UniProtKB/Swiss-Prot annotation:
Its EC number(s): 5.4.99.59
Residues reported in the UniProt entry to bind FAD: 12, 31-32, 39, 58-59, 348, 355-360
Biological role stated in the UniProt entry: Catalyzes the conversion of dTDP-alpha-D-fucopyranose to dTDP-alpha-D-fucofuranose. This is a step in the biosynthesis of D-fucofuranose, a component of E.coli O52 O antigen.
Protein name: dTDP-fucopyranose mutase
Keyword Flavoprotein: yes
Matching Gene3D superfamilies: NAD(P)-binding Rossmann-like Domain (3.40.50.720)
One GO molecular-function entry: intramolecular transferase activity
PANTHER family: UDP-GALACTOPYRANOSE MUTASE
Activity regulation (UniProt): Inhibited by Cu(2+), while other divalent cations such as Ca(2+), Co(2+), Fe(2+) and Mg(2+) have no obvious effects on enzyme activity.
Catalytic activity as recorded in UniProt: dTDP-alpha-D-fucose = dTDP-alpha-D-fucofuranose
Keywords of the record: Carbohydrate metabolism, FAD, Flavoprotein, Isomerase, Lipopolysaccharide biosynthesis
Amino acid sequence: MNKVLIIGSGFSGATIARLLAEENIKVKIIDDRKHIGGNCYDERDEKTGINVHVYGPHIFHTDNEDVWNFVNKYGTFQPYTTRLKANAKGQIYSLPVNLHTINQYYKTALSPTEARKLIASKGDQTINDPQSFEEQALKFVGEDLYKTFFYGYPKKQWGMEPKEIPASVLKRLPVRFNYDDNYFFHKFQGIPRDGYTPLFQNLLNHPNIEFELGKKVNRATVEELITSEQYGHVFFSGAIDHFYDYEFGMLQYRTLDFEKFYSEDDDYQGCVVMSYCDEDVPYTRVTEHKYFTPWEEHKGSVLYKEFSRSCDKEDIPYYPVRLVSGNSIWNKYEQKAKEETNITFIGRLATYRYLDMDVCIKEAIECAQLYIKNNKE
């Protein structure tokens, strides 16, 4: 088979690289950052020795056993239960919204059945087919909980009114009528014991894989490489608008700024992530990184305040911004991508979707398997 070029070394690109390499296909990975792993990259904080998720919290969770088995080949996963808290109107609540949250908020002692009836009575039953985040929230939890927990936070995160955000975003946020405070409900949940970076090092440790880090590419660069180095196919996992030199304009993404600070206290906030739901607090959440590795012991603590803002060309894009009204610019890029014969677009940025890590891996496995099947010699 021909050599393959992969742009990006996050889970999408790295998974394809490994699977192709095991089929004796020569693979070259190019990444514009000076490290592998994409946004999953982590490193030891020099001052405290705590392992820091440099680009924000990454907890692995999935119901897909094949994906779980795949990542466990390259790193030992420590079971991990994600328990988050929310700071709203001067009170600390459990997230996701559960029976404890409901009883605390309404100052009640309701049973699960009673809580279901209460929330059902609060919901706006005139909304039959919610299209926006706001409609989804009003229909299923009512105005009280919406205004307290689901208005200010997404407005800060996405930079727009919740009525402009698609309803699908809220479907990622569960509501429970028991006291379960595990944020995720998936069968498999964990964090690599040694960190994500060593996992990626193991994943990409193969004689058929080579790297070039710290190099940006676009459509013209890729065409030159295809010609000069005889690549048979390209898998691209970067921002699709950058790839096409913003031919149809820049797509909307959100980027994140992190403000690092230290505490002499061994435990600063009592949980891994504290979300700040009030609109007048400029940051969305605070992450205390030592909670990612409770099996380790460190003096003091290192934390990140997380600020969300609109993404410029020189920023790192994190979240694609999908609008209820649609996106004509994305439609043009999507059509152009479909016309490519030797380039496959993979991952969150290239396909302009909000994807969890396990979905990126699942789709990458499918892409690799299809390529191998179609190129058997």
